[in-house]
């Protein structure tokens, strides 16, 4: 599985950042260009039925090498990197045999990956670790997943003694902006179940996600010359501040963990005449999720009542739901991944995803899809890193899962 590092380093040098602002599919042209490159690579290693559609979805098949019928499994990763930080001119560095100390990412800018802030890195002391130069994210989310899947497929092709059923491979665009499954053709993909490789540290096995929605709050103010504004002006900036303060101050990402939900204010655009607030709403419990959506709408209603006119409009849109509901119907999909990890000396860590994956949506589209570790940490930022061994073990895990399904 040594090729996984070389592949990964090649992939992250291609800028595939997705965009929240774009209405195109995919949201950036670079994703489609990357999709075409991956399609060519899949053909080159020997996969069949390789396709890259106009929306940037890549699909391919590794044909079964056994006579009996077993479930067709899929492995999926996403091609885009987060819009949260630049993915242009990524300049990775390999820290060999990490010594357990702080890592200086950028001496000129004094950007340091500190162990007191990111203590999880100490788990990888003695290993080779890929880090950034402090100017960009790394792109392990999710190009590590892509590298691991392709490396595993090539390994299976080169080792026909390892028995497996039919395997489907899929790479999606725009996962980071919540659109990864929008145009995913489940029927064309042809798998009975699948796994995304989009998780964090080694051992992570995830079959629970948030229920997720987004909310846009539009506030219409009224601007009047401040010298004659009494009883006439409605300052949308101050109304926006009132709205923000009417939501629970402790139910935010930085003050919640585990199974706790939150309201997350993503952005504020405001001036006297108009203001716009963009939130995401998250909760694992479906009932609490529905209550949160009503709660944010109720804030708008109360402000409108206070001003005795409709100055606040709250629009809420569901994004995805907790995939546990669907995965529990085919529990063996998690059990096999658990057993595969044990078989290659990885201790499974069953954790809820405080986020979402393409698998969240796909599970409700008829393709149960839990999430496996890809190996990285600190996604979406300049402190992102991935241990090389974790990527190698993820590729090995894909092979072992395929083998276990063949032996069912």
From Swiss-Prot:
Catalytic activity: Release of the N-terminal residue from a tripeptide
Keywords: Aminopeptidase, Cytoplasm, Hydrolase, Metal-binding, Metalloprotease, Protease, Zinc
Record gene name: pepT
GO MF, one example: zinc ion binding
SUPFAM superfamilies: Bacterial exopeptidase dimerisation domain, Zn-dependent exopeptidases
Record: residues binding Zn(2+) 1: 78, 141, 198
Residue positions of the active site: 80, 175
Family indicated by similarity: Belongs to the peptidase M20B family.
Enzyme Commission number(s) of this protein: 3.4.11.4
GO terms under biological process: peptide catabolic process; proteolysis
GO terms for cellular component: cytosol
Residue numbers binding Zn(2+) 2: 141, 176, 380
Protein's recorded name: Peptidase T
Classification via PROSITE patterns: ARGE_DAPE_CPG2_1 (PS00758), ARGE_DAPE_CPG2_2 (PS00759)
Organism (species): Clostridium botulinum (strain 657 / Type Ba4)
